[in-house]
């Protein structure tokens, strides 16, 4: 249903944000 779609989207967004954060930290160091 709609809620599971929202949950899935939230998970992928969180994953992308985590990847971006790791990249930013790596570039800073």
UniProtKB/Swiss-Prot annotation:
It comes from the Eukaryota. GO terms for biological process: defense response to bacterium; defense response to fungus; killing of cells of another organism. Expressed by the skin glands. The keyword Membrane does not apply. Keywords: Amphibian defense peptide, Antibiotic, Antimicrobial, Fungicide, Secreted. It is found in: Secreted. GO terms for cellular component: extracellular region. Its main location: secreted. Belongs to the frog skin active peptide (FSAP) family. Dermaseptin subfamily. Potent antimicrobial peptide with activity against bacteria and protozoa. Also has activity against fungi. Probably acts by disturbing membrane functions with its amphipathic structure. This is Dermaseptin-S5. It comes from Phyllomedusa sauvagei.
